[in-house]
UniProtKB/Swiss-Prot annotation:
Similarity comment: family membership: Belongs to the glutamyl-tRNA reductase family.
Keyword Transmembrane listed: no
The encoding gene: hemA
Entry annotation: catalytic residues: C56 (nucleophile)
Chain residues that bind substrate: T55, C56, N57, R58, S114, E119, T120, Q121, Q125
Any Pfam family the entry gives: Shikimate_DH
Catalysed reactions, semicolon-separated: (S)-4-amino-5-oxopentanoate + tRNA(Glu) + NADP(+) = L-glutamyl-tRNA(Glu) + NADPH + H(+)
Note: During catalysis, the active site Cys acts as a nucleophile attacking the alpha-carbonyl group of tRNA-bound glutamate with the formation of a thioester intermediate between enzyme and glutamate, and the concomitant release of tRNA(Glu). The thioester intermediate is finally reduced by direct hydride transfer from NADPH, to form the product GSA.
Domain of life: Bacteria
Name of the protein: Glutamyl-tRNA reductase
Keywords: NADP, Oxidoreductase, Porphyrin biosynthesis
PROSITE patterns per the UniProt record, alphabetical: GLUTR
């Protein structure tokens, strides 16, 4: 069984491409079904195991398969699924086989591959991806084991290193950028669009600045109101956004919409109504919530997740000692997992040996029963049974020894010594 990870992330692709390859939550189960039934075309039980991790910064397909051509086929599947030309997508895709796939999973869950070094959000996102794959019936022995060990490694790394200490989060970076535009965030009106985990983190950081007003707009009014209440703000219907956008100095958006919810025309009208007072906008969604053309407007300062990356990286450099410690832990755990994987490769052989031996046993047992039924001496029947089983069980090894020559024979003899502890050494088999 081969492990394989196919993906793109913030290291290999810009947000303009990442948003085209992202999987909305409701599409993941159907996509996994397509992958299993169409991509490799294998009927159960040989269908590949698969899980999809899709976040703002990465889209990754983890799979376990017997197909040796899985790498190219997986990239082709991703290209076809998202209707992106293969020659456009391929340069940005990484394909990680076996131990590289294991190492990558461990690093991702531990926060070592994140834009925000050591951030914890990715671990929850990976657990959700595994839960979704499990519900879709696309997990099996290999990926289950990979992810269970992945979560254990992440816990070990975070518990024994300082990888997450004093990390500069995306939310904190957004506040820093806002302070470059507005000297006092406390004097500004802030609007959050969405009510998910990222918006909650951003609201926490902006609320700490004591803004003049804090408003949450969300498709689900109840959830938006609950979040706003936590921070002493108020909620507004998302449908009011076009008419009221001009009221806000700072707008932070992160929804699960597959299409932009803030267009160029709406922002142009807001800027005009504000008499060209600046608007600071942060788009943390992938796919993006705000049309990219908005960033070209004179009085609009629009930042995406990639733009916030530079500020985040400034805080990452000081924690390289923790990174080295985490990498050492991960490398040890990768080796442990690969030992388990190697051991799994002999399971089919052992199973076949048991099946074959049991078939021999059943055949000889039936033969012995027939002998007893016709009145043969029980002692003679037992002796014949034991002789027949002995001859058939050692037939394979003795035939292999007889066919072997030279060094191969010596190796086989030494191997047989391990099987049959009292067998003579190969050096003792020559005539004296």
């Amino acid at each position: 069984m081969q492990l394989l990870t196919i993906g793109i992330n913030h290291h290999t692709a810009p947000v303009a491409l990442r948003e085209r390859v992202a999987f909305p939550l409701e599409q993941i189960k159907p996509a996994l079904s397509t992958f299993k039934s169409v991509f490799l075309g294998h009927p159960a039980p040989n269908a590949p195991e698969a899980a999809i991790l899709s976040t703002c910064n990465r889209t990754e397909l983890y799979c376990a398969t017997d197909d040796r051509a899985a790498r190219d086929a997986a990239i082709r599947w991703m290209s076809d699924y998202h209707r992106i030309p293969a020659d456009e997508l391929a340069p940005h895709v990484y394909a990680l086989p076996q131990s590289e796939a294991v190492r990558h999973a461990f690093r991702v869950a531990s926060g070592l591959d994140s834009m925000v070094l050591g951030e914890t959000q990715i671990l929850g996102q990976m657990k959700n991806a595994v839960r979704t794959a499990s519900e879709a019936g696309s997990l099996g022995t290999y990926l289950n084991q990979l992810f269970q060990r992945t979560f254990a490694v992440a816990k070990e790394v975070r518990g024994t290193t300082e990888i997450g200490a004093q990390s500069v989060s995306m939310a904190a970076a957004a506040v820093r950028l806002a302070q470059r535009i507005f000297e006092q965030v406390a004097q500004q009106r802030v609007l959050f669009i969405g009510a998910g985990e990222m918006i909650e983190l951003c609201a926490t950081h902006f609320a700490a600045q004591g803004p003049r007003e804090l408003v949450v707009a969300n498709r689900t009014a109840e959830r938006g109101a609950k979040l706003a209440e936590r921070f002493g703000g108020r909620a507004m219907p998302l449908s009011d956004l076009p008419a009221r956008m001009h009221e806000f100095d700072i707008i932070v958006s992160c929804t699960a919409s597959t299409l932009p919810i803030i267009g160029l025309g709406a922002v142009e009208r807001a800027v005009k109504a504000r008499r060209h007072r600046p608007i600071f906008m942060v788009d943390l969604a992938v796919p993006r919530d705000i049309e990219p053309e908005v960033g070209k407007l004179k009085d609009v300062f629009l930042y995406t997740v990639d733009d916030l990356g530079a500020i985040v990286r400034e805080g990452n450099a000081s924690r390289q000692a923790a990174v080295a410690q985490a990498e050492a832990i991960i490398e040890t755990r990768v080796q442990n997992f690969m030992q388990w994987l190697d051991a799994r490769s002999i399971v089919p052989v052992i199973r076949h040996m048991h099946t074959q031996a049991d078939a021999l046993r059943r055949a000889e047992l039936e033969r012995a029963r027939k002998m007893l039924a016709r009145g043969d001496d029980p002692a003679a029947v037992l002796d014949a049974l034991s002789q027949a089983l002995t001859n058939k069980l050692i037939h394979g090894p003795t035939s292999a020894l007889n066919r072997a020559n030279g060094a191969d024979r010596d190796s086989l003899i030494d191997l047989m010594r391990g099987f049959y502890q009292h067998a003579p050494r190969s050096s003792d088999t020559s005539d004296h």
